[in-house]
Regions:
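All-alpha amphipathic helical-bundle segments outside canonical DNA-binding/catalytic cores
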Residues: 96-97, 218-229
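ATP-binding pocket architecture of kinase catalytic cores
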Residues: 1-104, 108, 115, 119, ...
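Secondary-structure capping and boundary motifs in well-ordered enzyme cores
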Residues: 101, 109, 145, 150, ...
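Conserved P-loop NTPase mechanochemical-coupling segment
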Residues: 113-128
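Hydrophobic packing residues in well-ordered alpha-helices of helical domains and bundles
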Residues: 61-68, 102, 127-130, 230, ...
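Active-site activation/catalytic loop segments of kinase-like enzymes and analogous catalytic loops
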Residues: 107-117, 180-217, 230-247, 258-267
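Active-site acidic catalytic loop and adjacent metal/ATP-binding pocket
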Residues: 75, 134-187, 197
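Regulatory N- and C-terminal appendages and interdomain linkers associated
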Residues: 9, 250, 254-289
Length: 289
């Protein structure tokens, strides 16, 4: 948890992040009552209308995704971030998703994929090349870590609140592991979802919407988006391999082809040639979805 900059489910973290998000004008649950030593809280109920569920029931997804992007943009425009966020359970530090944490996440791929695919053999030379390939990406991720990232921002952690307005229609939950990170982090979590297919044209529209709202350098942000998305997809594949191989949860195999599709596509983007060459050399096509 320390390397990954995780909160270990501490209720103080949830309460402090919730207060910060509400202060930024976003919809995070009100903390009605809190027992920090007991790890318990009574919080506002946003209902059951998860984005994934309402889209499945026929709600047009473009307005929902654009609202979710607006919520990200609102968070990114919320001003200077405190090193320690005050909250009803006490202060909680806003840690940086730095190069060590990013590399530690990526390393789950080389640690766990061979447990699931015995044909993979990552010896010392391969591991050294792995770290060298990702080093520019992790350095970039740390250097540009200047906004709060929800960190698990996807259609099953967002609740549709249609009676509210603008970005406040997006109810946020499961944000206790928020960190200081690159602005693209939550964007790729939302638009290259491990759990559901987001149409490429919707991904493109949503990214353009963010670029328009934030007035950023599109070329630089697209490059960073592909690089950090690729790293996170390698991490997620490692997590899924661990869930299957160690924890006996075979259902997670079903998510792996989607992650491979995203990763393979990102590896073809500019700036990832060294990482792509590593995968071409060390991971056979039969494993890569």
């Amino acid at each position: 948890n320390a390397v990954a900059r995780l909160s270990a489910g501490r209720i103080e973290a949830f309460a402090a992040v919730a207060e910060h998000l509400r202060g930024a004008g976003l919809s995070a649950p009100e903390i009605v009552a809190l027992d920090a030593p007991g790890g318990l809280a009574v919080i506002e109920d946003f209902g059951d209308d998860l984005f994934a569920r309402v889209i499945e029931n026929g709600e047009p997804q473009v307005p929902l995704y654009l609202a979710a992007v607006d919520a990200i943009a609102r968070l990114h425009m919320s001003g200077l971030l405190p090193e320690v966020m005050p909250g009803p359970g006490g202060g909680w530090p806003l840690l940086t998703y730095d190069a060590v944490a990013l590399q530690g996440g990526a390393d789950l791929f080389v640690q766990w994929m061979p447990k699931l695919f015995p044909e993979l053999d990552f010896g010392p030379a391969a591991l050294e090349a792995w770290h060298e390939a990702w080093a520019p990406v992790t350095a970039m991720g740390e250097q540009k870590a200047w906004v709060m990232a929800h960190r698990d921002y996807h259609a099953e952690n967002l609740i549709w609140l249609p009676d509210r307005t603008h970005h406040r229609r997006v109810g946020l939950i499961d944000f206790q592991d928020a960190v200081l990170a690159h602005p693209v982090w939550d964007l790729h979590s939302l638009l290259q979802d491990a759990r559901r297919d987001v149409p490429p044209e919707l991904e493109a529209v949503a990214l353009d919407h963010y670029f328009d709202v934030m007035m950023v350098d599109r070329e630089v942000y697209r490059r960073d988006y592909a690089a950090l998305a690729a790293l996170n997809e390698a991490r997620i594949l490692g997590v899924f391999a661990r869930l299957v191989a160690r924890d006996g949860k075979p259902r997670y195999r079903a998510f792996m082809p989607r992650m491979w599709a995203h990763l393979n596509a990102n590896l073809r983007k500019p700036g990832l040639e060294t990482v792509a060459a590593w995968f071409d050399r060390h991971v056979p096509a039969g494993v890569r979805g």
